[in-house]
């Protein structure tokens, strides 16, 4: 479990993380989202004990990390896959790290196979592609069989097979009861991997909860209704809290009520309905809506 309470980090007059409080529970994959500059990496560095908070506290499994007696068994973290010795092989990088924590060769061999590095374990890490470097970074993070795993953009540079491997790995770690916090800019992948979300904007917490709840409150979630009586049905459904959009065709887009309630109202009024389809905003759409005021640089219009 990760417990963050009142966490603040300032660099001079710039506040990177601002009074942040949230809990990451074990047994689920939690996505850590936010636009560039939101404070995600700074928060992860404070979780790892690499940056000292200006104020506030971080606890990992109830302890102030890295003061735990066996820190690699408490927290496995990947912040930068390039943080390896380029002149050493993948195996020797892992062996060197293992020695610092009293971890044996057998566990090194296990994480090499787990990360799919068996064929390149003897190759210099400096010659690895970004994707292979990510695999090595994940192997290092899992070396101590940690109860909590924090990964910053682990799918960067991975091919589709590697992305799927990360997805299944994170889910299996969560299924074992571990705490898993992962950041990514790939919303489609996060939608398939995470069940809980923590969303930052300009250093502040702007949302926390399930992926389902996050997307349910976004514009685009509702019911698509197809009927030749759009005007009459739209008038019938008009009520506080219900939005009806008529695009001039035989379709209505309705939010604030359910398909069952719409169908019942149409049946009682003897209005024909040809289609009732619940619609859901994608995670990307919901993310863009909730963070639009927290983006430092907006893209220009496309042609």
Mark where each language-model region is.
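ABC transporter nucleotide-binding domains
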Residues: 2-4, 9-182, 187-201
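Residues at or immediately flanking beta-strands
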Residues: 57, 222, 272-275
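Short alpha-helical
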Residues: 66, 85, 103, 188, ...
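Short, flexible cytosolic linker that couples an ABC transmembrane/permease module to its adjacent nucleotide-binding
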Residues: 110, 212-216, 299-300
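C-terminal coupling/interaction segments
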Residues: 257-303
